[in-house]
């Protein structure tokens, strides 16, 4: 395809997103109030617990096989690289702009955590449906393209999503140090703090020399081993609370695990996946539910952007203009350039296959705006809500340009 045709193909999904976002924006107006704060919160819960797991489960089970899984091994690595490079760029923005301490975690999160859900889910099908598109047959393009996107979403939820929350809560540090200290205490078998009182109370008795029989010695050693295991158990529980393992296994993650099991085990796959599968109705129902994820998330985005446009939110925000510019430069210039260097370098080293669609999805992960769930997190933690709304307003306003220019360049690069 010519460069102009690639540009038109890239602009169509952006226009679709803008149209649906404008509907959400209108529904969130005070005069309409169909998508107010409470409505967005409830709709977000439906997306989190119903739509997203259905989408990931149906798309991933349909496209994953042993061969495709081996071919896509670099996908979760690439997602982790976007997080690491974005975190580094966010740290550089903090060093240069010197924002208030309570906003540092938010800035790092906005630079590190990209929208690997809504945007690729809209962009890939729209490009695949384009007549004479750069990725060949539209049906195969959409099937495998959506498989790539859902796998990247799964990797995002598992390896990045909770890390991003920890960045936000701890302002970029604290949690990792706590994990390190707890781990060192377990490995070194140091005493638990709750035992210090009993140690101090028995200090005088420990100075007395006592003759202990061999049986008593063995019994004392057994008790010591039990105490040691109890200590290790306490440390493991403490670490699990820090990492919040329950939240890592979110509905979308559980759906992805089930989808992988169904897709990789041939008897289960033949029962559910395929036009002649006896339980095809399960796959069709999940697909029908999953199709509601994209418009619902985009409507929520439109409602959240309204908050950033209100003067009261802008005035109450402590975010400097230099911080906003730093986030924009990091996300829309430095991160995509880093992605081009990494993905093309991986291709030269035979770490990535030559399939254009696969490389395009890998590159697209570096060019998307910040994740929309950051706004939900600020509401949950009750801090940085106004600042997050302002950042989202600017980043998603410029995303119309970024998600047209960069995908055009990516398609030209890989085809």
Swiss-Prot record:
Location of the protein in the cell: Endoplasmic reticulum membrane
Residues assigned to the Cytoplasmic compartment are 35-44, 97-106, 162-244, 307-322, 377-389
Q: What do the Gene Ontology cellular component annotations say?
A: endoplasmic reticulum membrane
Chief location of this protein within or outside the cell: endoplasmic reticulum
Q: Which InterPro entries match?
A: Mem_transp_PIN-like, PILS1/3/4/5/7
According to its UniProt record, in which tissues is this protein expressed?
A: Expressed in seedlings, rosette and cauline leaves, stems, flowers and siliques.
Annotated transmembrane regions: 14-34, 45-61, 76-96, 107-127, 144-161, 245-265, 286-306, 323-343, 356-376, 390-410
How does the protein's chain sit in the membrane according to the entry?
Multi-pass membrane protein
Q: Which residues lie on this side of the membrane: Lumenal?
A: 1-13, 62-75, 128-143, 266-285, 344-355, 411-415
Read off the lineage from the record.
Eukaryota, Viridiplantae, Streptophyta, Embryophyta, Tracheophyta
Induction remarks: Up-regulated by auxin application.
* Function summary: Involved in cellular auxin homeostasis by regulating auxin metabolism. Regulates intracellular auxin accumulation at the endoplasmic reticulum and thus auxin availability for nuclear auxin signaling.
For whether the record's keyword set contains Membrane, the answer is: yes
Pfam families linked to this entry? Mem_trans
Keywords in alphabetical order: Auxin signaling pathway, Endoplasmic reticulum, Membrane, Transmembrane, Transmembrane helix, Transport
**Per the UniProt entry, what species is this protein from, by scientific name?**
Arabidopsis thaliana
Q: Which GO terms describe its biological process?
A: auxin-activated signaling pathway; endoplasmic reticulum to cytosol auxin transport; response to auxin
State the similarity comment.
Belongs to the auxin efflux carrier (TC 2.A.69.2) family.
Which protein is depicted?
Protein PIN-LIKES 4
């Amino acid at each position: 395809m010519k460069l102009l045709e690639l540009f038109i193909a890239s602009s169509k999904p952006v226009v679709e997103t803008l149209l649906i976002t404008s509907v959400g924006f209108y529904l969130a107006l005070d005069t309409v109030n169909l998508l107010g704060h409470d409505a967005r919160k409830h709709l977000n819960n439906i997306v989190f617990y119903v739509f997203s797991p259905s989408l990931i489960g149906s798309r991933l089970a349909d496209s994953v096989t042993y061969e495709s899984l081996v071919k896509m091994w670099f996908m979760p690595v690439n997602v982790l690289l976007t997080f690491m490079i974005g975190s580094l760029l966010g740290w550089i923005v903090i060093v240069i702009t010197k924002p208030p301490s309570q906003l540092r975690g938010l800035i790092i999160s906005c630079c590190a955590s990209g929208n690997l859900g809504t945007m690729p889910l809209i962009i890939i099908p729209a490009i695949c449906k384009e007549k004479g598109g750069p990725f060949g047959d539209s049906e195969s393009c959409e099937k495998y393209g959506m498989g790539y996107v859902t796998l990247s979403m799964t990797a995002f939820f598992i390896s990045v999503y909770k890390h991003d929350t920890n960045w936000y809560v701890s302002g970029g540090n604290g949690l990792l140090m706590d994990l390190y200290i707890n781990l060192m205490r377990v490995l070194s078998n140091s005493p638990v703090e709750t035992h210090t009182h009993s140690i101090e109370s028995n200090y005088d008795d420990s100075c007395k020399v006592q003759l202990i029989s061999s049986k008593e010695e063995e019994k004392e050693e057994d008790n010591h081993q039990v105490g040691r295991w109890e200590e290790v158990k306490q440390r493991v529980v403490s670490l699990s609370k820090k990492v919040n393992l329950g939240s890592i296994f979110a509905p979308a993650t559980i759906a992805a695990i089930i989808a992988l099991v169904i897709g990789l085990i041939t008897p289960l796959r033949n029962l559910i996946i395929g036009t002649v599968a006896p339980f095809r109705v399960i796959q069709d129902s999940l697909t029908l539910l999953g199709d509601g994820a994209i418009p619902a998330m985009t409507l929520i985005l439109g409602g959240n952007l309204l908050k950033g446009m209100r003067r009261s939110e802008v005035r109450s925000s402590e975010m400097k203009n230099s911080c906003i510019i730093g986030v924009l430069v990091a996300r829309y210039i430095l991160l995509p350039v880093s992605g081009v260097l990494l993905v093309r370098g991986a291709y030269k080293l035979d770490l990535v296959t030559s399939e254009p669609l696969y490389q395009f999805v890998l590159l697209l992960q570096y060019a998307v705006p910040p994740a929309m769930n950051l706004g939900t997190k600020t509401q949950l933690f009750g801090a940085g809500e106004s600042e997050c709304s302002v950042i989202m307003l600017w980043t998603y306003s410029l995303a119309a340009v970024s998600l047209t220019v960069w995908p055009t360049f990516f398609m030209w690069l890989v085809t």
